[in-house]
Curated annotation (Swiss-Prot):
EC number: 1.2.1.38
GO molecular function term, any single one: NADP+ binding
Cellular localisation: Cytoplasm
UniProt-annotated catalytic positions: C147
Catalyzed reaction equations: N-acetyl-L-glutamate 5-semialdehyde + phosphate + NADP(+) = N-acetyl-L-glutamyl 5-phosphate + NADPH + H(+)
Stored Pfam families: Semialdhyde_dh, Semialdhyde_dhC_1
GO biological processes: L-arginine biosynthetic process
The protein, known as: N-acetyl-gamma-glutamyl-phosphate reductase
Pathway listed: Amino-acid biosynthesis; L-arginine biosynthesis; N(2)-acetyl-L-ornithine from L-glutamate: step 3/4
One cellular-component annotation, GO: cytoplasm
Enzyme class: oxidoreductase
Similarity section: Belongs to the NAGSA dehydrogenase family. Type 1 subfamily.
Alphabetized UniProt keyword annotations: Amino-acid biosynthesis, Arginine biosynthesis, Cytoplasm, NADP, Oxidoreductase
Gene giving rise to this polypeptide: argC
Length: 343
């Protein structure tokens, strides 16, 4: 059994890791770390976990017996705590944005904080699971993608790879539920402000914009810029990303659907919807699926892609476990076979 530790145990990402890893046949949750709740029983913070008798612990580097540690923490915590663990030889999967952006200047411009050391950035492997493989011996630090980038990159990757788009035309209109903001209180997520309301935010300067651009540029082999506008909607979970992109070759809905279906034929967590149907966030709730609907406006040769995920599962903890499975050469679906919760 692989001994796993979870850092940031009082947050939503960590709680999803605990929920999902309980069904993983090759994993035991050895330690749950939270610096603010040391020695408190887990069930005190999360009463729905009454059946789990573990207590929160303080993270230590010396004598740490974990094979893998998941970090579901803010980026500053990850930047400080992860390098010593990696140096010790422990595999780390980081759910924060600390190691995603390889250019330190760009990171600091968007995150408004000092970037990680360049050596740490160079060693971190950014992993959208559907196109990644690892060397178990050589890979020590995996940088889990953000939620918006996951939904967006999975939809765009086939089109960019096949070089069938005008790279200057990418527009991403994305909606997210409130859990994406974490458990910290703020006026923006106060019930009276959020309920029966819809708002755009971080226009032009969202932290996920450079992440999307960086990895689209890698796929394209040239610099790619996008227009990305996120919106906050009054629901708990879910991301719906509607992507508009001009096609540089003549495609119909049928031919683009065929390309996308072929591209993801062997990827169990990406479901290309039938022509004429488009996914909703409820249809992936609580699951590791990304559902994608496709339409081509032949008059303007514009592809419209609708991509949905659960931001806490495929957009965070589920993909982190998927990366664990790849790292240890398990079946990619191990511990992640949950059907969406419906209704």
């Amino acid at each position: 059994m692989i001994k796993v530790g979870i850092v940031g145990g009082s947050g939503y990402g960590a709680i999803e890791l605990i929920r999902l890893l309980q069904t993983h046949p090759h994993v035991t949750i050895a330690h749950i770390y939270s610096h603010s709740k040391v020695d408190e029983p887990l069930k005190l913070t999360f009463p729905h976990l009454q059946h789990i008798m573990q207590h929160f612990e303080a993270l230590t580097v010396d004598n740490n017996d974990c094979d893998v540690i998941f970090f579901a923490t803010p980026a500053p915590v990850s930047k400080t705590c992860i390098p010593p663990l990696v140096e010790k030889g422990i595999h780390v999967i980081d759910l924060s944005g600390a190691f995603r952006i390889k250019n330190r200047e760009i990171y600091e411009a968007y995150y408004k904080e000092t970037a990680a050391a360049q050596d740490d950035l160079n060693h971190a492997i950014y992993s959208i699971s559907e196109w990644q493989s690892f060397d178990n011996n050589g890979t020590k630090l995996i940088s889990n993608p953000g939620c918006f980038p996951t939904a967006t990159l999975l939809a765009l990757h086939p089109l960019i790879s096949e070089k069938i788009v005008d790279l200057s035309s990418i527009i991403i209109d994305a909606k997210t539920g409130v859990s994406g903001a974490g458990r910290s209180l703020s006026q923006r997520v106060h019930f009276s402000e959020m309920n029966e309301n819809l708002s755009a935010y971080a226009i032009g300067n969202h932290k996920h914009k450079p992440e999307i651009e960086q990895y689209l540029s890698i796929i394209a082999g040239q610099d790619v810029s996008v227009i990305f506008t996120p919106h906050l909607v009054p629901m708990t979970r879910g991301i719906l990303s509607t992507i508009y992109v001009k096609l540089s070759s003549e495609y119909t809905t049928e031919s683009l659907h065929k390309l996308m279906t072929s591209y993801y034929a062997n990827q169990p967590f990406v479901r290309i919807r039938d022509i004429g149907t488009f996914p909703t966030t409820k249809e992936v709730l609580g699951s590791n699926y990304c559902d994608i609907g496709i339409y081509v406006d032949e008059t303007t040769q514009t592809a419209i892609l609708v991509s949905v995920i659960d931001n806490l599962v495929k957009g965070a903890s589920g993909q982190a476990i998927q990366n664990l499975n790849i790292l240890y050469d398990f079946e990619v679906t191990t511990g992640l076979n949950q059907s969406p919760v419906y209704p």
